[in-house]
């Protein structure tokens, strides 16, 4: 038995200079797992609660000492003596101990950090890599895939201080033979984009996730400069590289309208979907995330109707990694893909349940970081261990993003042909 003998919580810093929760789980025999909770900027209203202290005299109210105390107090007491390999049982103990719908008593940041640390400790106890342990927890032992990265190389919206409304413009190196080559392609495009922007006299400062954040006149301009960079880097857009958008549309949804302030345009629900469809006809955009507000379910039905057969429509704020909400989406034919963020739901077990439900319904699952990250690379192991096929973990700079890419390089080196890189086949509507 992988007996838990100690649980430790502490306050550490995330990539935006805000506190977050780190946890350690110690087992008999000296096995230790350590993990940290990430934090989002554009958040869905139905996400599990990230517990902050609210003490304005400390970290401007963003301290997490209350959540840390919950780790070191009630969570530790409840888990001492339990078996770390029984992940579902551990997570349920913490969920029951919290007793709320959105984990606002103990904090999703406290529960998640312990949940992931326990998984890492259990993997160490079993003498296997974390991705292999996750595959076993998922009921798919030995079934792996290297994910196609969605690389956020140009930022707008909540992730940058500029006049671009769409939050993320991403490249996907779908023509690569393996993940290592995909990473190289993305890096070359990233550096070429810097030269293109510099040549136009535009800013090459970066946003929260490492993408550039220049002041462009429109969202179409953002796509145009990326196209230029891809081609200058020696790649063919639409064959070697495809494009993906994260609109984060909830951030500019006001009074039932989509207000693109940067463009000086206001759309109704169907009008904005038509606008996005027109972009997919001009550029090889194969994936659109949060193309409408999380509450605009009628609009989502229309968007899915006009694009769902050819474009991957990813629900992030829409589904918040929650199986109850995803069930409603599946039953109503809303979207065709789900973004998976650990901290939206708050435990590894619930995260795996959302991935399994999506796959069973023919939806894709895209594993994702948050804008506030740490050096913790657990999502890399999650992507491979569930054979999710796609990952979003930022641009090709900032060590909090690159840590995940480097872990994927190590995993690919270990697994070789056991973890194929399937490129375009992983993306809904493109197989």
UniProtKB/Swiss-Prot annotation:
GO terms for molecular function: magnesium ion binding; phosphopyruvate hydratase activity. (2R)-2-phosphoglycerate binds at residues 167, 341, 370-371, 392. Keywords: Cytoplasm, Glycolysis, Lyase, Magnesium, Metal-binding, Secreted. Mg(2+) binds at residues 246, 289, 316. Component of the RNA degradosome, a multiprotein complex involved in RNA processing and mRNA degradation. Belongs to the enolase family. This is Enolase. It comes from Shewanella oneidensis (strain ATCC 700550 / JCM 31522 / CIP 106686 / LMG 19005 / NCIMB 14063 / MR-1).
């Amino acid at each position: 038995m992988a007996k838990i003998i100690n649980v430790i919580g502490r306050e550490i810093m995330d990539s935006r200079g805000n506190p977050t929760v780190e946890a350690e789980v110690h087992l008999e025999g000296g096995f230790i797992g350590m993990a940290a909770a990430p934090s989002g900027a554009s958040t869905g209203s139905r996400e599990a609660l990230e517990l902050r202290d609210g003490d304005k005299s400390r970290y401007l109210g963003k301290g997490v000492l209350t959540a840390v105390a919950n780790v070191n107090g009630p969570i530790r007491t409840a888990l001492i003596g339990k078996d770390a390999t029984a992940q579902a049982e551990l997570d349920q103990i913490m969920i029951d101990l919290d007793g709320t719908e959105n984990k606002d008593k103990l904090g999703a940041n406290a529960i998640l950090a312990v949940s992931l640390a326990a998984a890492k400790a259990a993997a160490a106890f079993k003498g296997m890599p974390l991705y292999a342990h996750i595959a076993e927890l998922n009921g798919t032992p030995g079934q792996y895939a290297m994910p196609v990265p969605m690389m956020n190389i140009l930022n707008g919206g909540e992730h940058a201080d500029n006049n671009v409304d769409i939050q993320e413009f991403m490249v996907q190196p779908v023509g690569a033979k393996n993940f290592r080559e995909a990473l190289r392609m993305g890096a070359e495009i990233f550096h070429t984009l810097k030269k293109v922007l510099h040549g136009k006299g535009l800013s090459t400062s970066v946003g929260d996730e490492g993408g550039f954040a220049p002041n462009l006149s429109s969202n179409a301009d953002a796509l145009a400069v990326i196209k230029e960079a891809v081609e200058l880097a020696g790649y063919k857009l639409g064959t070697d590289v495809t494009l993906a958008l994260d609109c984060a549309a909830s951030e500019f949804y006001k009074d039932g309208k989509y207000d693109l302030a940067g463009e000086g345009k206001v759309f109704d629900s169907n009008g904005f979907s038509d606008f996005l469809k027109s972009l997919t006809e001009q550029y090889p955009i194969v994936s659109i995330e949060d193309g409408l507000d999380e509450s605009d379910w009628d609009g989502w039905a229309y968007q899915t109707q006009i694009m769902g057969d050819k474009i991957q429509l990813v629900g992030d704020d829409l589904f918040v990694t929650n199986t109850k909400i995803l069930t409603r989406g599946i039953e109503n034919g809303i979207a065709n893909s789900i973004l998976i963020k650990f901290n939206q739901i708050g435990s590894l077990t619930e995260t795996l349940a959302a991935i399994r439900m999506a796959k069973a319904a023919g939806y894709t699952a895209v594993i994702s970081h948050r804008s506030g990250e740490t050096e913790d690379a657990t999502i890399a192991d999650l992507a491979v261990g569930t054979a999710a096929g796609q990952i979003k973990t930022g641009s090709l700079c900032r060590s909090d993003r690159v840590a995940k890419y480097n872990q994927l390089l190590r995993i690919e080196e270990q697994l070789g042909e056991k973890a194929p890189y399937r490129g375009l086949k992983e993306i809904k509507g493109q197989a």
